[in-house]
Amino acid sequence: MLTINSDAKLKDLLEFPCSFTYKVMGHAKPELPELVLEVIQRHAPGDYSPTVKPSAKGNYHSVSINITATSIEQVETLYKELGEIDIVRMVL
């Protein structure tokens, strides 16, 4: 989760609207990309083509998705909600 200091720094670095990529890592379950897209669509509707890559041992998958972010609040909300998905272990 972002802290107040990192929020201020992130806000200063970004000029909205901007392209923003989320990388979501979770258990290698077939529903992972669908769950990620469901959260993204709630806050940034669009036509997305996420990239899914397996880990070396195949236990985890990473889902990368690029959105057009419109505000720092949207970025923070997506980090929070993507991290709340049960099978997700990390959001970058």
Curated annotation (Swiss-Prot):
GO cellular component, one term: cytosol
Pfam families according to UniProt: DUF493
InterPro entries in alphabetical order: UPF0250_YbeD-like, YbeD-like_sf
Entry's family note: Belongs to the UPF0250 family.
Xref: NCBIfam families: PRK04998.1
Protein name per its UniProtKB record: UPF0250 protein VIBHAR_01213
